[in-house]
Amino acid sequence: MSTTAYPDTILIIDFGSQVTQLIARRVREANVYCEIVPFQSADEAFKRLQPKGVILSGSPHSTTDIGSPRAPQAIFDAGIPVLGICYGEQTMCAQLGGNVESGHDREFGRAFLDVQEDSPLFAGIWAKGTRHQVWMSHGDRVTSLPDGFTIIGTSPNAPYAVIADEKRKYYGVQFHPEVVHTPDGAKLLQNFVHRIVGVKPGWTMGAYREQAVEAIRKQVGSGKVICALSGGVDSSVAALLAHEAVGDQLTCILVDHGLMRKDEAQQVVEMFREHYNLPLILVDASDRFIGALESESDPEKKRKTIGRLFIEVFEEEARKLGGADFLVQGTLYPDVIESVSFTGGPSVTIKSHHNVGGLPERMKMQLVEPLRELFKDEVRLLGKELGLPDSFIGRHPFPGPGLAIRCPGGVTREKLEILREADAIYLDEIRKAGLYDAIWQAFAVLLPVQTVGVMGDGRTYEFVCALRAVTSVDGMTADFYHYDMNFLGNAATRIINEVRGINRVVYDVTSKPPGTIEWE
């Protein structure tokens, strides 16, 4: 993902696990820079990044299958520490001369691990002879070890639950330390990167700010730059970074695509012109966007249409400015991860993000993406570093495609106005209840379903509004927010009474996974 090798990088090779992103989060929390790469491009990434250590992820594959993914031999030839997690442990063993078999007792869920030997991996956390909760998810298991390895931890169904070659600094764990269900897992990963790899905790937002500003200057040179400003945290932080880097070479452009929240465009313009002194152009392109989306119900096509129109508008505005060479976007690391297929097939791509996979292949400007390596919570920390107020940094995430993906089916002005009003009421109720900061993201969805209702003495046949609220740390996984039912009742009553076009309100209790946070 990065074009520059950081001096202290951990490379995470993804074999297709659903929780690989959590490994990266735990490593970043230890103030160490890391990158996730799919196994197919691991050789290239290893040469480019020159990592100090490598972590091998879990996988739905079996090492006993012909053609199953393997780690590059180069990592074992490099003499650097390696940690294999679940499948990562198994493929490391298989590649180094051990044996892995299928068909043994499987372990899924909570298990208890017995520590057989002390190790730098356990230092300050677990001691020999103690037992600890871990989270297992495996069908295969190691049955014999490569030369140099010893068993340092066991569980009832995994006699090789933790293995180590202390001399070469190779470690394997059959459980998943990256998930919260392994209570000491984050500390184990910290031990690996700090004690075993020897990387110091130098990954901070202050350091990132300096590196990002320098990288922007190097990429842009004396070229003209425009920034795709939406008013959200991501694009705002990207704009401030770019402005710090290139000053008057930057012009910010806010496209009002008609898909923003209530009064949002005007609020954004006032804030940036008055408080940040950034050159800002407001473009009303609502007719163009809504017209293109009215007959489009496929969510992927909606995202790609929005991405295409964004670029068209920006290119037109750039021409009015006398030409621009670069376009700044607030693309985040989860956007990039979710837009990459890690097994080479389209079925693995969760959704195209309008500012990654949704962009047209032919662009007349080069992309500048200074936040491409950051998770959402890191962007907020960077925003604080740049001086943005807490009230702004703490705003809930809002997707680039806006209300278009909260309005399943074709998009019309009428539907958008109904949704905008319902969403504003819902967020107002959340703020009045003092819940806004406890929730990662909350919003209303206008369903393409109408139901019968009764208002006064008359029959109604109007839309259904779904309310969504989730808790999360980084947007990669999320749980629905557990409201008090009185709150939901009050919010539903206000929406039905105050918004014409809605006669029924429901609440979404789906977590991520299996669902995504947004409906489309």
From Swiss-Prot:
MF (Gene Ontology): ATP binding; GMP synthase activity
PROSITE patterns assigned to the protein according to its UniProt record, in alphabetical order: GATASE_TYPE_1, GMPS_ATP_PPASE
Catalyses which reaction(s): XMP + L-glutamine + ATP + H2O = GMP + L-glutamate + AMP + diphosphate + 2 H(+)
Keyword ATP-binding on entry: yes
Highest taxon listed in the record's lineage: Bacteria
Residue ranges crossing the lipid bilayer per the database entry: none
One Gene Ontology CC term in the entry: cytosol
Segments forming domain GMPS ATP-PPase: 203-395
Catalytic center residues: C86 (nucleophile), H176, E178
Quaternary structure note: Homodimer.
Stated name of the protein: GMP synthase [glutamine-hydrolyzing]
The species this protein was found in: Brucella ovis (strain ATCC 25840 / 63/290 / NCTC 10512)
